[in-house]
């Protein structure tokens, strides 16, 4: 099966993603990893430990909008186009999402209702309550952990 893992960070960085991908590959699956690059000059396609890495450019400014993913849909719409391309180009049969901030982008891009696993590594809405930028005056106006909780 062609599994598309979705990570909204550069790769390789997170050992959990590598470990899960390796386990899936060892079980006979093809793993394609959607990830982002903040650099304009990057290797778009790569193979690392049998993981087919597909990098997409994301500006730092756009990435900062991921903090507003469930308040304003900018990040969702920009990333969903990239994810839609990834799904079609690689003929993905199952999606595996690693981060809540990109989940709405994946759901928006998944026009053919490919089976999807949402594998959250942390309880982001609870953690957000301790983030300095969420507790700032502007953060309290723009970022709602409650909206993330119901997402």
What are these regions (language model features)?
Residues 58-73:
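Phosphate/nucleotide-donor binding subsite
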Residues 80-85, 124-125, 139-151:
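Membrane-proximal helix-turn-helix segments that form the acceptor-binding/catalytic region
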Residues 14, 40-42, 76, 94-113, ...:
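An aromatic- and histidine-rich active-site surface loop
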Residues 16, 71-79, 146-150:
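Soluble or luminal CAZymes and related metallo-dependent hydrolases
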Residues 1-41, 45-47, 51-52, 88-90:
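N-terminal subdomain of nucleotide-sugar transferases
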Residues 34, 56, 119-120:
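Generic beta-sheet signal
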Residues 18-22, 84, 106-107, 151:
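Short amphipathic alpha-helical segments and helix-helix/interface helices
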Residues 48-54, 129-135:
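Short, flexible, mixed-charge acidic loops at enzyme active sites
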């Amino acid at each position: 099966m062609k599994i598309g893992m979705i990570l909204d960070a550069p790769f390789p960085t997170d050992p959990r993603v590598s470990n899960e991908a390796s386990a899936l590959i060892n079980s006979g699956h093809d793993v394609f990893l959607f990830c982002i690059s903040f650099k304009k000059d990057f290797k778009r396609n790569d193979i690392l430990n049998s993981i087919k890495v597909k990098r997409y450019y994301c500006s730092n400014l756009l990435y900062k909008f991921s903090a507003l993913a469930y308040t304003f849909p900018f990040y969702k719409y920009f990333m969903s186009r990239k994810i839609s391309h990834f799904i079609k180009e690689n003929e993905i049969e199952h999606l595996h999402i690693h981060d809540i901030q990109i989940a709405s982008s994946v759901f928006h891009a998944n026009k053919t209702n490919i089976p999807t696993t949402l594998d959250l590594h942390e309880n982001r809405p609870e953690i957000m309550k301790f983030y300095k930028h969420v507790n700032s005056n502007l953060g309290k106006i723009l970022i709602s952990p409650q909206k993330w909780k119901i997402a």
